[in-house]
């Protein structure tokens, strides 16, 4: 028997992510309390709750750290929500945004920023913002046409923008020009905060920490820690001030691990998401699907080449000002510095100026230096630049780390993943689309080392596709010939842009049924992110019109065939959907459920995945009033697993169970066993389970999905005859 898991604070059993909006605030969440309790979750996980831009649909554009957002119900509404949830045995997790605030329109909507624009470095809020005061003024990139700003008393107006007048401490520049401040990625409307300053930390966290102390908030999710000057120090200060369960939105690549000295409980789960997805992808599909992709798009076979080109483009397009500022600190050859940034294989390394460089961080940057050196002329000062960003002046060390993340995010997440997509279910945040399939043994080894406090997830507000869209796409790895024939048929009828068409067909099928409005919005965003034909900075009305025509024709002329293909793979997609959901919910860690995904959800990237959720339908299904069989099955798996987790010691060890090539199976201590079908097409083609069996741990077991009871060695054909998954509880 394992020792019971203990922590000095309450660790959620599971969480349910809610996207708060002006239309869905605290009162609406409170009304869900009975449903969520019956579903089995332990905590409601709220999107940002501080005052944000009016009508903001996401809340990451904070305008005032001293107030709870009025549109949601304000502080009293939040307290009432917390009380209602508590009555149902539920807690509250809050999403906090320490890295940035918004530059609103009009700019007077951010009082702290207005003070700085008015009084410059003499403002008491000047230390809040990461501003480059070179020349005594901060660049504000808002000018988009020949209209002249107009002075109106103490205000300078430019269209909807407002600035203090006179313009003593700022200059208005072209909107495409880099701003005079650190920003979130390339988003000039989000200005970086300096929470490394203790006074700034205290001022920007006072309300949130007060809610923690009051017992209204029970845990925290930290947005974008990689933007901070010193994430380790920030998390130490946060833990000292709050001492509650805390997870961080840290994107890990490949075998990268969360720094051991970070005082937090884990990540928000993208690392687990990508490993689970690969479990349900057949590596044998790699070669034919890559060839199919190359044939349709003309893109390279090699993903790494696309990544390098994409990162170079975003550095040149978006980050000239940031690189110039960094180069001023680092010195030496600018091109060497750029190549080092492009070569970084992860979002950033972690070095604290004045402290010894951690071995893992040194290895990351030095390895990137070797890659950069191979691309630069002989004699380029790579070693000197590497040494400066690891051991040089404090600003050089910190600025380098803070720009690595934006280059990776914009170059890979928001460019390369929209250019290289042989199998789009692999194109996720932190994913590696050239890494087809996952080895069961490797997954078991990873799962055995998972922390009981880290978050796991399958869908978030930032995923490129919902879990059920990915479940459908994963089937294509087992049906490359059938998929090639279908795409060939559709493309012969309707085509538009070779760089986009193949992505369009994947997403049209996987998100089916989808109307022309949603489908156009997705492809329009995808085309702008890819930047091969249009971009956010370079729109093209003619291209947009052509895309609208493509969308209409694709649905009108090919919709019936697309629907037929989706229906044909439904048994396999359903198996993938239920399998990945069961695995995620029963792994070590704190499983998060993105709102609405307790049943099927075929959403694409935001804002599509932030649409309102039909909770009356979900209540009806949970009450057993019938519905779509896939929905019923997914809800049953979700509800049974979440409620079993409430009865399970979170420290129950992960024990791999042998189940052959077409199943993933594991026990959680002596109380639970999960079995999920994988690669279902191959299983069907070989004639089913045959004589394969699974040996259950000692004792009597009951399948929570069917009520059947088992002991000892069980034929998989018997165990999985009703559902493609089984969830057993020890009796």
What does each model-found stretch correspond to?
Residues 1-54, 62, 66-71, 79, ...:
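Carbohydrate-interacting/catalytic domains
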Residues 54-58, 105:
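Short glycine-biased active-site loop of nucleotidyltransferases that positions the nucleotide triphosphate
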Residues 81-126:
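Hydrophobic or amphipathic alpha-helical targeting/insertion segments
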Residues 100, 228-229:
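Catalytic P-loop NTPase motifs of RecA-like helicase/translocase cores
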Residues 116-119, 125-178:
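DnaQ-like (DEDDh/DEDDy) 3′-5′ exonuclease domain used for proofreading
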Residues 216-225:
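Active-site groove signature of glycoside hydrolases
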Residues 338, 342-346, 507-508:
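C-terminal reverse transcriptase regions that engage the nucleic-acid substrate
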């Amino acid at each position: 028997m394992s020792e019971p898991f203990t922590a000095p604070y309450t660790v959620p059993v599971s969480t349910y992510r809610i996207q708060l909006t002006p239309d869905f605030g605290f009162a609406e969440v409170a009304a869900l309390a009975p449903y969520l309790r019956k579903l089995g979750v332990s905590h409601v996980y709220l999107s940002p709750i501080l005052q944000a831009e009016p009508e903001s649909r996401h809340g990451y554009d904070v305008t005032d750290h001293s107030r709870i957002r009025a549109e949601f119900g304000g502080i009293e509404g939040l307290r009432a929500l917390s009380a209602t949830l508590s009555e149902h045995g539920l807690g509250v997790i809050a999403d906090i945004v320490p890295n940035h605030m918004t530059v609103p329109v009009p700019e007077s909507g951010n009082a702290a920023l207005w003070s700085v624009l008015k009084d410059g470095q003499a403002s008491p809020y000047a230390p809040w913002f990461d501003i480059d005061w070179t020349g005594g003024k901060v660049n504000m990139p808002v000018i988009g046409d020949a209209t002249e700003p107009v002075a109106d008393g103490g205000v300078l107006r430019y269209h909807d923008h407002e600035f203090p007048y006179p313009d003593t401490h700022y200059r208005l520049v072209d909107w495409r020009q880099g701003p005079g401040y650190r920003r979130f990625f390339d988003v000039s409307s989000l200005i970086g905060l300096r929470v490394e300053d203790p006074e700034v930390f205290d001022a920007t966290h006072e309300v949130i920490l007060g809610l923690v102390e009051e017992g209204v908030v029970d845990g925290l999710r930290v947005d974008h820690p990689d933007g901070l000057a010193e994430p380790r120090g920030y998390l130490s200060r946060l833990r000292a001030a709050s001492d509650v369960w805390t997870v961080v939105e840290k994107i890990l690549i490949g075998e990268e691990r969360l720094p051991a000295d970070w005082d937090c409980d884990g990540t928000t789960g993208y690392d687990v998401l990508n490993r689970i997805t690969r479990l349900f992808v057949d590596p044998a599909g790699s070669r034919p699907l890559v060839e199919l992709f190359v044939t349709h798009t003309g893109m390279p076979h090699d993903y790494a080449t696309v990544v390098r080109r994409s990162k170079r483009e975003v550095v040149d397009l978006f980050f000239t000002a940031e690189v110039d500022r960094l180069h001023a600190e680092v010195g030496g050859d600018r091109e060497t510095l750029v190549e080092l940034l492009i070569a970084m294989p992860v979002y950033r390394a972690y070095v604290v100026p004045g402290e010894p460089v951690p071995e893992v961080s040194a290895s990351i940057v030095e390895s990137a230096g070797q890659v950069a050196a191979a691309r630069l002329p002989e004699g380029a000062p790579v070693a000197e630049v590497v040494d400066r960003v690891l051991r040089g002046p404090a600003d050089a060390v910190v600025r380098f780390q803070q720009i690595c993340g934006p280059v990776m995010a914009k170059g890979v997440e928001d460019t390369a993943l929209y250019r290289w997509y042989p199998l789009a279910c692999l194109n996720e945040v932190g994913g590696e689309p050239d890494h087809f399939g996952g080895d069961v043994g490797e997954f078991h080894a990873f799962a055995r080392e998972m922390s009981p406090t880290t978050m796991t997830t399958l869908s978030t507000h930032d995923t490129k596709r919902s879990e059920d869209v990915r479940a459908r796409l994963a089937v294509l790895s087992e049906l490359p010939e059938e998929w090639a024939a279908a795409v060939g048929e559709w493309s012969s009828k309707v085509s538009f842009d070779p760089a986009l068409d193949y992505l369009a067909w994947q997403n049209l099928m996987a998100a089916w049924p989808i109307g022309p409005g949603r489908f156009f919005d997705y492809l329009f965003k995808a085309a702008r992110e890819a930047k091969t034909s249009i971009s956010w900075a370079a729109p093209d009305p003619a291209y947009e019109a052509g895309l609208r025509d493509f969308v209409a024709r694709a649905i009108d002329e090919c919709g019936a065939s697309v629907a037929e293909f989706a229906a044909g793979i439904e048994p396999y997609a359903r198996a993938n959907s239920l399998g990945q959901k069961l695995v995620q919910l029963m792994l070590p860690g704190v499983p998060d459920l993105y709102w609405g995904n307790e049943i099927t959800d075929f959403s694409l990237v935001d804002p599509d995945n932030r649409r309102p959720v039909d909770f009356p339908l979900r209540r009806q299904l949970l009450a057993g009033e019938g519905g779509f069989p896939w929905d019923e099955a997914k809800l049953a798996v979700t509800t049974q697993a979440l409620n079993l987790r409430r009865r399970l010691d979170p420290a129950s060890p992960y024990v791999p169970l042998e189940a052959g090539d077409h199943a993933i199976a594991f026990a959680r201590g002596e109380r639970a066993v999960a079995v999920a079908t994988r690669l279902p097409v191959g299983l069907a083609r070989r004639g089913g389970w045959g004589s394969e069996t699974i040996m259950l741990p000692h004792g009597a077991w009951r399948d929570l999905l069917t009520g059947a009871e088992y002991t000892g060695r069980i034929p998989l054909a018997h165990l999985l005859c009703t559902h493609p998954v089984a969830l057993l509880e020890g009796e």
